[in-house]
């Protein structure tokens, strides 16, 4: 595997079989997709928030991780769909994928934001309730304006997903981490619909959440509005399972308070879910880069390449120091080539006795290939 920059002007290496492409929305990536497609390369990827993670740092532009004949085999399926059709589209995508690759070692998913859970449900059903471990992220742009795109072949999809299966003669590893700690505040969802959280413990959700945050949302609660700058360090966590003494959480990012007292979220929640106020720090967002690489690489041999997915909301916090994410990830995988995207949602597998693929926010996931 090797990382290749569209801006370098260098010729494509010989024997490229597949290309993972990450790009900022202002980069001229469509000619790159056409060039790769003309060479018979399987192409997949997404647009990324403010930059792309490459071994040299966090840079704007279009970049590709190229796989050759000695690397894992990749097969991809795309679907243009919306929320209503996403579940059935995912089932049909799996059926198409399995015709040429009955049981991938790992799945990579890139979707446009808004209906990731429906896609995961369809994938689960398509694999008869036992899908391979899945990792990936939700396409992003620079300002939540909807310019995000999923990359599939020579196409940039504004609503849909691309599902990639990898098979390899060598082990493939993955991990999915939160990097936030549970606090003492918690409550149970008593009214919710999809990504709208209306009530916690019988009270308006925005009122309860603001109380947990110490009143920082008081003015916005009166008018309604975007609260991302107030909530990135305090997402809502839902326990997935326990491994030994450790409870593992999937995170939900509240992004808006409504005048009716509800919270708009970037994931689904359900009535009966217990929510925990999670606590993060800027340094912890860097530390979890080490965690995601170390957990994926635990017991692994030499790494030949990797894929990193890191939440765009966290990039808003790490700011000018975001290149440290690339530096630390690269060091952990002993400077093997890798490519990463800053996304508006993350998908990953909680491995263990009962593996489960989930969609979350403010998280990080990785795939490492031996």
Locate each region found by the language model.
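Small-residue-enriched flexible segments
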Residues: 1-42, 46-319, 323-336, 341-370
């Amino acid at each position: 595997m090797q990382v290749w920059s569209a801006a370098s002007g260098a010729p494509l290496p010989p024997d490229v079989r597949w290309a993972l492409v990450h790009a900022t929305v202002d980069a001229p990536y469509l000619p790159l997709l056409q060039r790769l497609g003309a060479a018979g390369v399987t192409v997949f990827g997404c647009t990324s928030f403010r930059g792309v993670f490459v071994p040299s740092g966090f840079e704007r532009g279009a970049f590709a991780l190229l796989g050759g004949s000695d690397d894992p085999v990749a097969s991809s399926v795309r679907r243009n769909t919306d929320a209503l059709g996403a579940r059935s589209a995912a089932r049909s995508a799996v059926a198409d994928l399995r015709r040429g690759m009955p049981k991938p070692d790992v799945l990579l998913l890139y979707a446009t934001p808004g209906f990731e859970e429906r896609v995961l449900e369809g994938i689960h059903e398509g694999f008869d309730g036992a899908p391979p471990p899945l990792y990936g992220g939700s396409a992003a742009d620079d300002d939540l304006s909807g310019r995000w795109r999923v990359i599939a072949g020579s196409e940039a999809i504004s609503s849909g997903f691309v599902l990639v299966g990898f098979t390899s003669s060598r082990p493939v590893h993955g991990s999915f981490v939160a990097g936030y700690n549970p606090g003492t505040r918690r409550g149970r969802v008593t009214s919710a619909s999809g990504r709208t959280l209306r009530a916690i413990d019988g009270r308006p959700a925005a009122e309860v959440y603001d109380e947990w945050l110490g009143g920082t949302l008081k003015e916005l609660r009166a008018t309604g509005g975007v609260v991302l700058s107030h909530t990135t360090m305090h997402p809502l966590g839902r326990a997935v399972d326990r491994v030994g003494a450790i409870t593992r959480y999937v995170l939900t990012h509240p992004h808006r308070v409504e005048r009716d007292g509800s919270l708009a979220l970037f994931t689904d929640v359900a009535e009966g879910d217990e929510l925990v106020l999670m606590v993060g720090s800027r340094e912890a967002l860097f530390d979890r880069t080490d965690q995601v690489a170390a957990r994926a690489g635990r017991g692994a041999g030499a790494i030949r390449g990797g894929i990193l997915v890191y939440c765009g909301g966290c990039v808003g916090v790490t700011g000018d120091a975001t290149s440290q994410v690339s530096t630390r990830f690269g060091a952990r995988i002993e400077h093997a080539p890798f490519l990463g995207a800053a996304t508006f949602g993350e998908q990953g597998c909680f491995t263990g006795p009962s593996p489960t693929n989930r969609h979350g926010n403010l998280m990080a996931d990785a795939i490492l290939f031996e």
